[in-house]
Amino acid sequence: MRIRPGESHDRVAVSVYIDNCDPDDAKDVLDRMRLSTRQVKNTVRVHTDEPVRDTSYWKWVRESTAQLYIDLKLPPKTDADIRTPAGEIDADGIQGAIVIDAAACPIHVSNLSGSLKITAQGEPVSVHDFDGDLLDIRSTASTIDVARAVSSVVNLSSAAGTIEARSIQAVLNLDAHGSPVTLADIDGSIHGDLNASPLTLHGVPSSEVNLNAVGSPIEASVEPSFGADVQLEGRPVELDPSLTFRGEREPERVIGRLNNGGSGLKIRAVPGSVRCVRGGGV
C-alpha cells in the first residue's frame, strides 16, 4: 500500500495497480482476488472477499508472479487510521494525525508532519524525516529505525527486536525487552528501561540521560569535551581514564563530574556492565 498526498482537499482516491504480469492477465488477477472498495462515512475499506480455494486457485498462487499495489491519495492535511493484516505500507509526504496498525507488514514512513503512532509485529519499521508533536512506535519482533526526527516526544518500545535511532531532537523514551538499542546524535533528554537489551550511545546528549537496565550492558561513547554530572552503577563500571573526571571511583560505582559538569548522566545496570568511553572529537 502506497500512501501519498492527493490534490483534493476533501476526497480520498484509491487506485489499484497490477504489476509483473501481462496486461491480459491483470483482469484475471483482480477476478481471483475479488477486490472491492467501500466507503462508509469517513471510513474507506479496501478488501478481498474470501476466494474459492480449490485446486486451481492454489496452483495459480504458486505460479503467479503478479504483484498488486494499492495507492491511497489522502487530502494534503488529514487524520488517518490505517490498518492492514499483510502486505507493505509505504507512506510519504503526508500531514496530520496518523495511526498505523499492521501485523507481518513492513512499514516505511518518510517526510511526515503531525503525529504518528505505529503498532507493528514481525516486520521492519522505518521512520525518516519526521516533524511533529508525537512519534510513538510499539513493536514485537521488529527492527525499528528512526532517523532525522524533530518532535516534542519520541516513544520507542520493542520486544524481541532492535532499536536504532539517530539524529533525534526530542525527549526520547525507551522501553526495550530483549532488543539491542543503538542511539546516536540525540538532542534532548533520554529516559530508558532496558531488560536484556544492550544499549550503545554515541554522541553528546544535550540534556539529562537516565537509563536503567536489568541484565543488559550499557556503553556510552562521549566526546572528550563532554561535560556532565555522572552517576554510573554496574558490575563492573568502567570510566575511560582519558576523560577528564573529578569524583569518586569504585569498581561498581562512579559519581562525579566530567569536565566542568553539566546535565545529568545517570546509568544503572543491575546486573550488567556500564562503560563510559572516549569517542571522537578533541
Question: What are these regions, as identified by a protein language model?
Answer:
Residues M1-V282:
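Intrinsically disordered, low-complexity terminal regions
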